[in-house]
Amino acid sequence: MPVNPPFPLGQVVATPAALKLVPPEVLLQWLHRHQTGDWGAVGPQDWAANDRALTDGDRLLSSYLTDGGTKVWIITEWDRSATTVLLPEEY
């Protein structure tokens, strides 16, 4: 039985740099993890902030690492209108 995710992703976009580094199948896995509350490689404070944001309506930030060790962020806006995949230096 499918389970509804805790929040919508809205329009999903990715920067060219992120698309160059992350294979499509990995990107889909990360988006699923993000949408189901697995925030990846964030610290405990950011993890707790994301958990609070699910009810408070703040932005959500996940961080994942490529096989080469490059950090990639996934950010869903506070209003859940859009989710962006980007490198931290592009923020």
Region roles according to the model:
Residues 2-61:
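Compact soluble domain cores
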Residues 56-91:
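Short, compact, well-ordered microdomains
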